[in-house]
């Protein structure tokens, strides 16, 4: 009898799936809410850090941080050895949703009018790999 009840509960739970979302399907992220005024939940700054598959920071999005309400986004690119290679300058996004931007370097180049809107980090050719 116990097995029969357990079987029916399992079958019924399959008919009504629960919807749980912790991360997006393509990106891991951490979302931080900083409240700017005590007792006023509408006055807050939302910061979303997106990470790649190895847990390295890939993008930092400040949601609705620009004066016109758009997002401000900065990014990091890594070289073949996993070291920071380029840090993209913070640019205004065309979105205000806090979402991940897949073509951030192209959007930054369009926004600034510069072909290379980043800081490139060089390393010395030694086992110590010190930053130049």
Over which residues does each language-model region extend?
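Acidic, low-complexity segments
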Residues: 4, 20-132
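Bacterial N-terminal signal peptides
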Residues: 6-15
């Amino acid at each position: 009898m116990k097995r029969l009840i357990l079987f029916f509960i399992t079958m019924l739970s399959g008919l009504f799936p629960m919807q749980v979302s912790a991360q997006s399907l393509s990106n891991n992220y951490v979302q931080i809410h900083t409240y700017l005024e005590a007792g006023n939940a509408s006055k807050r700054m939302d910061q979303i850090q997106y990470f790649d598959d190895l847990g390295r920071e890939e993008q930092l999005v400040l949601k609705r941080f620009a004066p016109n309400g758009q997002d401000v986004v900065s990014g990091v690119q890594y070289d073949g050895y996993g070291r920071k290679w380029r840090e993209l300058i913070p640019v205004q996004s065309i979105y205000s949703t806090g979402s991940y931007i897949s073509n951030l370097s192209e959007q930054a180049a369009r926004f600034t009018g510069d072909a290379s809107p980043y800081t490139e980090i060089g390393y010395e050719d030694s086992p110590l790999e010190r930053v130049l």
